[in-house]
Each structure stands twice: as structure tokens, then as C-alpha cells.
Amino acid sequence: MHQGGPHNVSIAALAVQLKEVNTPEFKKYSEQVVSNSKTLANALMAKGEKLICSGTINHLVMWDLRQHGVTGSKIEKILDVMHITTNKNSVVGDKSAVNPGGIRLGTPALTTRGMTEEHMEIIADFLVRSVKMAKDIQEKSGKKLVDFVAGLNESEEVKAMGEEVTAFAKQFSIPGV
């Protein structure tokens, strides 16, 4: 039986992390994460998208999709097929967390791969295009998530955009891989 108390591996991991975050390189990285997030938020808003808090001051962007009549669950699914990882997220005014009206977008992984502000503009375009595709699929397949997913898996347009996203992402290495 293992009881609580200090664990040497946890203490060592914390020491390494504290040393890393105290470097000029980490400060520069952190500033780039926030700059990328702000650029992504501004690019989405410039395309007419609504964000929670009208922007961001940190590494996250909360995108309110309710104006489009599609749920965060559906956008999460379509983006996943396109090789873009997001999280569905409830937004203020949602009636149920099962069908959230938003998507949470983060920039740390993108920044770690070497993406900068110019790349956030391209990503914003991918995101906005995905909503149009989702609306078209929902119109053809119906509002139920299971029907949407079936329609999504049959969409050649979605597959083509997934290939476009993959080609874009291949420009950037994945650290440690």
C-alpha cells in the first residue's frame, strides 16, 4: 500500500519545470502563444465570427457557434475528421451541456510546432470553412448528431479539406517525434 507524502519523481519533475519556465526562451514561447491566440481571435472576428468576451487575453479562444445553427459537438466532429483538434464547450445561455454552443481553441500546441501569427490567419480560414461545410451536411443529413456524423463521413469536401490541413501541418515538425 502506498501512502501520501513526497514522491521523488514528482519533486524532480517540478524542479525541472520550474527551471525551464525561468528561461528567456520559455518567456518568448509564452508570449508567442498569447500573440497567436490574439491573432486567431482577431482573424475569426474579422470573418464575422462571434467569440466569448470578444477576443482573448490568454492561450484560449472561446468560439460561439450559435449564430450558425450548429452545435459545438458537430463542429468538434467535423474538425476531428479534418485533423484539427478542438473541444466542444458550453457557452453562456446554453440550455444543455450535451449540445454545447461553442468550441474551445488553444494555441500552445500550434506554437510548439513553430506556427506564428501568419499561420493563425490560415487556421481561421480552415475553421470558418468547416462551419459552412457543417451547415451543408446538417441541412442534408438532419439535426441529430448520429445522422450528421454519417453525412460527415460521406463528404468528399470534408475529406479534401482534411488533406489540405494535413499538407499545411506537415510544414511544422512535432517536437520529440
Regions found by a protein language model. Name each.
Residues M1-T71, N153:
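Active-site C-terminal subdomain of aminotransferase-like
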Residues H2-G5, V9, A13-V16, E20, ...:
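Alpha-helical context
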Residues V16, E20-T23, Q67, V81-T85, ...:
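Short, well-ordered loop/turn and helix-capping segments at boundaries between secondary-structure elements
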Residues Q17-E20, Q32, N36-T39, A43, ...:
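Generic, well-ordered alpha-helical scaffold segments in large soluble proteins
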Residues K28, K74, H119-I122:
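An acidic, carboxylate-rich microenvironment
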Residues N36, A97-V177:
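PLP-dependent enzyme catalytic core of the Aspartate aminotransferase-like
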Residues K50-E117:
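Conserved PLP-binding catalytic core of the aspartate aminotransferase-like
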